[in-house]
Design a protein with these regions (language model features):
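Short glycine-rich substrate-engagement loop in P-loop NTPases that contacts/grips substrate
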Residues: 94-101, 117, 132-172, 182-189
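Structural motif
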Residues: 172-174, 206
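Walker A/P-loop nucleotide-binding motif
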Residues: 108-128
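A short, well-structured juxtamembrane/interface segment
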Residues: 90-112
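A short, basic N-terminal segment
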Residues: 1-94, 248-271
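Short loop/turn elements that form and flank the Walker-type P-loop nucleotide-binding site
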Residues: 109-110, 138, 167-169, 200-202
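Walker B catalytic acidic pair
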Residues: 177-178
């Protein structure tokens, strides 16, 4: 639409918006300014257009930041689908995980982390991923990794301290599957350094593990006990039980395969 179609000149000589009726010009105080008697101003339509433009760029910047942080957070793209929207929110632990996010500022201020423990396949990693994705939406810097990856990444580095400090710098660090990594003296030394540096940073830590809590609390091996004591010092333990979700999925796939195979067999018999 042309400007002349939306603007008219009032009896006072000022331009007015035909849509909202507000003036698009205003007079300078008496005497004018550098020989000019009037200056431009935003009408309601202009202000609305400006606000919409600012919102567009702010939303675009937010989406790009979240996308960038998400790619840094996860090693596998499938983890991006681990969200509360895709979860069974009637589950008690899942509800607590959502409460953790809802109270993130307080959790962060009080350095409160979580230890999700329980049998294999019950959804501990999924719960941690839901927390990560929800906080990523809030522009929180999160890193979700495991000690096998950390040990592999750190092994060839001359300056291991820089890598460990980088892990400590994330607003939330999630270590998945504690206990599946190698038990060598070198590996345990790296694990302790990462955990200890994280705790000294004062930033929250979330751990998932298949190890029984009793085993964690009663560990007799000195190197492991030092690690577990530091974790229990910072993390609230939550048991994640129930039927193995992996077994349920595998069973569903098996039933689907049987159905398809039987269907195909029936078609062959009819030929």
């Amino acid at each position: 639409m042309r400007e002349e179609d939306t603007v008219c000149v009032g009896s006072d000589g000022l331009q007015y918006c035909k849509v909202c009726g507000e003036a698009k010009e205003a007079f300078f105080p008496e005497g004018g300014f550098m020989g000019m008697k009037k200056h431009s101003r935003q009408c309601a339509c202009d202000r609305k257009a400006y606000e919409e433009e600012q919102k567009y760029f702010k939303d675009k910047e937010h989406r790009e930041l979240v996308s960038r942080n998400t790619s840094i957070c996860f090693d596998e793209s499938r983890m991006e689908e681990w969200t509360f929207e895709n979860a069974d929110m009637s589950d008690a632990v899942m509800h607590k995980a959502k409460s953790y996010v809802d109270n993130w500022e307080e959790m962060k201020r009080n350095h409160i982390g979580c230890l999700f423990w329980g049998p294999v396949g019950t959804g501990k990693s999924f719960i941690a991923g839901c927390i990560a994705n929800e906080l990523l939406k809030q522009e929180v810097m999160v890193k979700m990794t495991n000690f096998n990856t950390i040990i592999d990444d750190i092994f060839p580095l001359a300056d291991k301290t820089e890598y460990i400090n980088a892990l400590a710098s994330y607003q939330l660090l999630i270590i998945d599957d504690l206990g599946v990594e190698r038990n060598s003296e070198y590996a345990l030394g790296i694990i302790f350094s990462v955990i200890d540096r994280r705790i000294r940073s004062g930033r929250p830590l979330i751990i998932t593990t298949n190890l029984p809590l009793k085993e964690i609390k009663n560990e007799t091996m000195l190197d492991k006990r030092r690690i577990y004591d530091r974790i229990l010092e910072m993390c609230t333990s939550m048991y994640v039980g129930g039927t193995s979700k992996r077994e349920v999925i595998a069973s569903m796939k098996m039933e689907k395969a049987k159905t398809l195979l039987n269907t195909n067999r029936g078609e062959e018999d009819c030929e």
